[in-house]
Amino acid sequence: MEIHCKHDPFAAMHRHGGVNQLGGVFVNGRPLPDVVRQRIVELAHQGVRPCDISRQLRVSHGCVSKILGRYYETGSIKPGVIGGSKPKVATPKVVDKIADYKRQNPTMFAWEIRDRLLAERVCDNDTVPSVSSINRIIRTKVQQPTNQQIPPSNHSIASTGSVTQVSSVSTDSAGSSYSISGILGITSSNAETNKRKRDEGIQESPIPNGHSLPGRDFLRKQMRGDLFTQQQLDVLDRVFERQHYTDIFTSTEPIKPEQTEYSAMASLTGGLDEMKSSLTSPSSADIGGTVPGPQSYPLVTGRDLASTTLPGYPPHVPPAGQGSYSAPTLTGMVPGSDFSGSPYSHPQYSSYNDSWRFPNPGLLGSPYYYSAARGGAPPATAAAYDRH
């Protein structure tokens, strides 16, 4: 039985095609003929659903949807270009129109430019550039590059003086606008002088190992610049060279008088006065005895206070002028039959005055304090210190 394919549009290409699931014939790599495409659009205009069009024409549903979608979007039923690149749509006429639109309204979007090209019939649905193409045209051809050089014809019009002035300004702005001299408004002559001084400083202060890195004095000169006067520089040197945290073991500098005026010294003065009053007045029988007026008594310096109050450090032996009380003075506080000899035999604490060993010196010399220690044992506070 012979099959006649006279009216079949695919009759000449049956050897390269196949049959889809709906029974229709297709050709690999080739678009649908324009006759089938036109019939798909006509059925869609009649209100036939895409699924029914697919069954009637035996064309796959995906192909029908793609053809109708392109038709609704662009109004064209032509297939895409097969092989090669798309025809050039950025013609000089289109580029000039895009440039005119952009100059008239710099904030116009690419899709607005595309719609205007279609409205003014500069392009049709097949030749209108896409949104991305319009953006690329604006970026590469419409907008002028910022680094364009001035044509040499402009320089020939200006006089020699103006050309020299423009060149000097451009050189200065390009070379020193972001430098320290440019920010501070220092003229070029001063900048050159400072640069020459820095270069001389580098040559005059080499490091002994052979490298020519700048030394300490050069770094100071470089950081100072011309911002400070000589008097201000001297004050800054004194401030930064002062040792704020003195070493309590290795420092041999005498403590200045103003460094001893701490708030801790004020609180220590009251305790020393109370202790001295209790030692010098044997008639004080109770804790609330009257304290006499202020007495002259040597204060412990801030260095000694820091060395004795820091935990974990060995105690600092006070100087000769700040020695502890003598043994007769301390033994006079306790009856001789109960406690004789040196009150404390521990060498670590025997060289300190009582203000460091007794937190409340007002209790010294009180009969109530020693009422429980009549058995000949030393006071509890001293025993506690001896165990340490």
Curated annotation (Swiss-Prot):
Any one Gene Ontology MF annotation carried by this entry is: DNA-binding transcription factor activity, RNA polymerase II-specific
Q: Name the segments for region: RED subdomain.
A: 93-141
Q: Which SMART domains match?
A: PAX (SM00351)
> Compositional bias of type Polar residues: which residue ranges?
143-158
Q: Which InterPro entries match?
A: Homeodomain-like_sf, PAIRED_DNA-bd_dom, Paired_dom, Pax2_C, PAX_fam, WH-like_DNA-bd_sf
Question: So which tissues is this one expressed in?
Answer: First detected in mid-neurula embryos in the folding neural tube. With the completion of neurulation, expression becomes localized to the midbrain/hindbrain boundary (MHB) till at least stage 40. Expression is absent from regions adjacent to the MHB. In tailbuds, weakly and transiently expressed in the developing otic vesicle from stage 21 to stage 27.
Region of interest (PAI subdomain), ranges:
18-74
Q: Which GO terms describe its biological process?
A: nervous system development; regulation of DNA-templated transcription; regulation of transcription by RNA polymerase II; sensory organ development
Q: Which GO terms describe its cellular component?
A: nucleus
Q: Which residues bind DNA?
A: 15-141
> Which residue ranges does the record annotate as region Disordered?
143-162, 191-217
Localization annotation: Nucleus
List keywords of the entry alphabetically.
Developmental protein, DNA-binding, Nucleus, Paired box, Transcription, Transcription regulation
What's this protein's function? Answer: Probable transcription factor.
Protein name as annotated: Paired box protein Pax-5
Organism from which the protein derives? Xenopus laevis (African clawed frog)
Write the gene name: pax5
